[in-house]
């Protein structure tokens, strides 16, 4: 009988890499050689084995299991881990919004026989930024000289942090400091700054920075930079300039994407130049740029603003023909226009057909339908929709619910009113905000004392009566 061949660290690394289930990978890591003839002999893991399992566990947010592997790595003194492994671990903790664990990992790196440099510090700063821990970022910056000189990545993280926290002038000061210290800015640097300037309506400064990044610093603008500038120009009504920038991007061999075209189409529609949209769509086709869901939603919105439900519906059908899946925004816009032009049957049919089309209605969908049916005095249908939305955990707008109850009271629809009270009882019995709408509204109508008794009994049983207004 031949001897059982033991699993090598090379073989284990291969098995771990091919295992898609992180839990199964962890089980394999814990017991890599179950048929070993000497179970007391510890398995000799390679650095690659540790790297693969750490990546799988961190990417799946299995942080407790990750801690177990890290502890094993710490005590495995044969292995000298590379810094990039800890950079990845710190990034995983940042994505998981675990700043204390990220800090702890960085502080413990020397115990793993790994020297810290500005690279791992950058990972820590990035993780803290993701967690919104700006003060802790400042604390760590005070000791940056221990790990080396700040590089472009360091400045990019800090500039992004200032921009995100609303201190944009500080971001510009960091850029000046960066240049003085002869740290070359990157495309990320300029992208963050130009986006911030555009957001702050400082379009002239943003355009100058776009000019300087190429002429002074030799960094080519990206499609994202052009997107920020074109959007900002459209917002201030500079459509001609926006189109010139789009042409400039093509001249610079930058492929303009659907997001830029969507911005331009939206701006043309808002400016009352809808007749020019077809030319933009033709250009997109010529340039090989396919419209995406956002582009089609912009077109749908344009038709909905003009109350042209037929054209909006045609765009919806075209999306499906082109292999694009309309999203809930697409449907909500068309539902809205159907109700505005009093096409209740078409709206109800589309709403009911959404799940079959692969799109589940959201809170806004239900509110649009409920509000539309109420305005159309379709009380029975509105009560059914209200019951369904409450069952799914959605709530109507306070003012619309108040108006619905008022209309039911005024029209004497007591049977429907009773069903509505029953629905509210099941759906949001403990919601004082909703009951505070119902009681004063219903108390105005003397003919519905039975309904009021039912309502008050419901509140006594399930709601905070002390918070309720009295009749």
From Swiss-Prot:
GO biological process: embryo development ending in seed dormancy; fruit development; root development; shoot system development
Domain of life: Eukaryota
Entry keyword annotation includes Cell membrane: no
Keyword set, alphabetical order: Repeat
Pfam families according to UniProt: PPR, PPR_2
Alphabetical list of InterPro entries matching this protein: Pentatricopeptide_rpt, PPR_P_subfamily, TPR-like_helical_dom_sf
Ranges occupied by PPR repeats: 46-81, 82-116, 117-147, 151-185, 186-221, 222-256, 257-291, 292-326, 327-361, 362-396
Repeat among keywords: yes
PANTHER family: MITOCHONDRIAL GROUP I INTRON SPLICING FACTOR CCM1 (PTHR46128), PENTACOTRIPEPTIDE-REPEAT REGION OF PRORP DOMAIN-CONTAINING PROTEIN (PTHR46128:SF211)
Family label: Belongs to the PPR family. P subfamily.
Function: Involved during embryo development.
Protein name according to UniProt: Putative pentatricopeptide repeat-containing protein At1g53330
Species annotation: Arabidopsis thaliana (Mouse-ear cress)
């Amino acid at each position: 009988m031949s001897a059982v061949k033991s699993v090598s660290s090379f073989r284990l690394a291969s098995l771990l890499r091919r295992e898609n289930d992180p839990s199964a990978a962890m089980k394999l890591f814990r017991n890599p050689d179950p048929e070993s003839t000497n179970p007391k002999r510890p398995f000799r893991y390679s650095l690659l084995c540790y790297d693969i399992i750490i990546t799988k566990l961190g990417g799946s947010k299995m942080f407790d299991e990750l801690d177990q592997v890290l502890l094993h790595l710490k005590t495995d003194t044969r292995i000298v881990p590379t810094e990039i492994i800890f950079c990845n671990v710190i990034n995983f903790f940042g994505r998981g919004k675990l700043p204390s664990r990220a800090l702890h990992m960085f502080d413990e790196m020397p115990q793993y026989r790994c020297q810290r440099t500005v690279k791992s510090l950058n990972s820590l700063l990035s993780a803290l930024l993701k967690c919104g821990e700006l003060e802790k970022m400042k604390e760590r910056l005070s000791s940056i000289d221990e790990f080396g000189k700040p590089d472009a990545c360091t400045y990019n993280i800090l500039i992004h942090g200032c921009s995100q926290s609303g201190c944009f002038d500080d971001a510009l000061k960091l850029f000046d400091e960066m240049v003085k210290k002869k740290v070359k800015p990157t495309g990320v640097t300029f992208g963050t700054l130009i986006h911030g300037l555009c957001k702050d309506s400082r379009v002239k400064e943003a355009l100058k920075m776009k000019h300087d990044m190429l002429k002074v610093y030799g960094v080519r603008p990206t499609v994202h930079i052009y997107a920020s500038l074109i959007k900002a120009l459209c917002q201030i009504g500079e459509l001609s300039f926006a189109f010139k920038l789009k042409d400039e991007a093509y001249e610079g061999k930058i492929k303009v994407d659907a997001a830029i075209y969507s911005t331009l189409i939206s701006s043309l529609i808002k400016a009352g130049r809808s007749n020019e949209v077809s030319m933009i769509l033709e250009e997109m086709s010529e340039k090989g740029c396919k419209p995406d869901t956002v582009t089609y939603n912009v077109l749908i919105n344009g038709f909905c603003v003009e109350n042209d439900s037929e054209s909006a519906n045609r765009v919806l059908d075209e999306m499906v023909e082109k292999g694009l899946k309309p999203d809930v925004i697409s449907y909500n816009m068309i539902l809205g226009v159907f109700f505005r032009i009093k096409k209740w049957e078409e709206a109800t049919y589309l709403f009911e057909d959404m799940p079959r089309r692969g799109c589940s209605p959201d809170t806004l969908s239900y509110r649009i339908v409920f509000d539309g049916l109420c305005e159309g005095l379709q009380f029975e249908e509105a009560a059914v929709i209200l019951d369904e939305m409450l069952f799914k955990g959605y709530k109507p707008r306070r003012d619309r619910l108040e108006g619905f109850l008022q209309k039911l009271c005024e029209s004497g629809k007591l049977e429907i009113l009773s069903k509505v009270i029953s629905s509210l009882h099941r759906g949001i019995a403990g919601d004082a905000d909703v009951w505070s709408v119902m009681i004063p509204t219903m108390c105005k109508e003397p003919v519905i004392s039975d309904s009021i008794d039912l309502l008050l009994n419901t509140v006594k049983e399930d709601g905070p009566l002390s918070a309720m207004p009295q009749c």
